[in-house]
Amino acid sequence: MANKILVVDDEPNIVLSLEFLMKQAGFQVRTASDGEAALAAVTADTPDLVLLDVMMPRKNGYEVCQAIRANPDWKAVRIIMLTAKGREVEREKGLALGADDYITKPFSTQEVVERVRELLAEAG
């Protein structure tokens, strides 16, 4: 059975691009366009991994990451933050809140696929 990926970003072009990329890599993909929708999606059908933008309406990525990590039922969910905020302080904040990885935009599509595969392999 294919791993489930949730793509969360408020930019439709990025969502479409990542959705296509993840499906081509063999993953099941769902999408959300804001933080509230992301948490609703995680609640409805817990993914194996979340590709999570930081700057979004209705809860930012940091808040979503924190909410996922606060719920023991979602402990196994892997989180990769994808963001234009590339300063070290933002990266440290994301990792401190429980993100497993942090990739800055613009990103290499192959790098995203490889990091997703690596995290899922580590998770077992």
Predicted features and spans:
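Two-component/phosphorelay signaling modules centered on CheY-like receiver
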Residues: 12-30, 119
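Receiver (REC) domain active-site loop signature in two-component systems and cognate sites
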Residues: 56
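C-terminal output helix
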Residues: 107-117
